[in-house]
Amino acid sequence: MTERLIITSSSEIVLKSPTVRRFMENRLRRQVRDALRRKGIRHVYITKGGGRTYVCCSDPEAALQLILRIPGIDFASIAFRTEPDISLMCNAATECLAASLSVGQSFAVRAKVVDNKALSKKDIEIRVGQAILDRLADKALRVNLDSPDKTAYVEVRGADAFVYSDIRDGSGGLPVGTQGKMLGIFSDVALSAVASWMMLRRGALIIPVCLEAQRDQSSVPLATIANSLSRFREWVPVPRLVALILRTEGVLRRINEMTTENVSKLVYLGSILRALDAIATEEGALGVVVANRTMLDPAIISRCRTPIYQPLIGLDERELEKYISILGIGPGQVHEPHGLLAECAEKVPDLALLLDDRELQDEVMSMAKNRETLIL
């Protein structure tokens, strides 16, 4: 009997201790199941073994595209599962390579045998390779063990054999939520989503916080932020994601009464971080993710007791554009959210006093208390 399924690997998870590894594998399996069911893919059955996770479902092709987005998945491929019989493995390997190999191209067969003494790795590679040459003789294929155009992988594990060829890179990292929750500020077209996505891949469940701010002409409308947020949502493998919306009119009004335009940018960010500190305590979040690519001023950071993470520091424009493309956001402007530059703070010796203004603090706490929710 031969069936098609998806084979996945999680290389970072296998490095953990047995207890932690079991916890992460269970979380990852649940998230794979939730992600597939959320998109209408049924008959999902998931097993694991030997550092691999096997996903059987009604639509392997559609499921593969979803699985590749799930943090914790290092690579995935559609595979054939058969009995560990040479003839069946030859059939599966030939089918794997038949459509992808062109005339005159080269291939290799890589085998791995675990818990099966009846078969040897070398014997599988020779016999499967010869079968491919014979059955696809019209393509005049060549064997190249050093740099093949295509590779057929055959894994024999006990009473099962898995054959696959097209390996696709996944998100990597750790399963979402295994490292706690964080608040992610969404305030621009693209960089906010990239920053939150990078922390998502490190195991943090991101609670998006959208800023409804009309501070100046460079401010991004909430509708535009929502589009970026919807793209980010496709990478979060949970059934229900709750985003928060902060209405900043009162805070902005007080800031404009107190400061000049250049100073207001810094006071604005400090006020937002103070509000997020209060929200983080209520939500049980362990950190705040910001997309700024320059170091924040200590006077601003000190207003937030919750740790602040800046994952975009150190990334150049080429890397950022690559990640924006991966997220599917489309062309984005690689610039600091809100135009906030750290060096401006050196010219504001009374920044701490401005941030501690009593009326401003009242507006900040009111904004945090009256936050709205959006179910994604």
Question: Whereabouts are the PLM-identified features?
Answer:
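Short glycine-/aliphatic-rich beta-strand segments at the starts of folded cytosolic domains
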Residues: 1-22
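Nucleotide-activated chemistry modules centered on ATP-dependent adenylation/adenylyltransferase
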Residues: 4-7, 23-26, 31, 35, ...
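A short, flexible beta-alpha/helix-coil linker loop
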Residues: 12-15, 114-116, 251, 260
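Secondary-structure boundary/capping motif
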Residues: 16, 120, 217-221
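Generic alpha-helical secondary structure
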Residues: 21, 25, 29, 60-64, ...
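Non-catalytic nucleic-acid substrate-recognition regions in nucleic-acid-modifying enzymes
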Residues: 34-112
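Non-catalytic substrate-recognition/targeting regions of SAM-dependent transferases
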Residues: 83-176
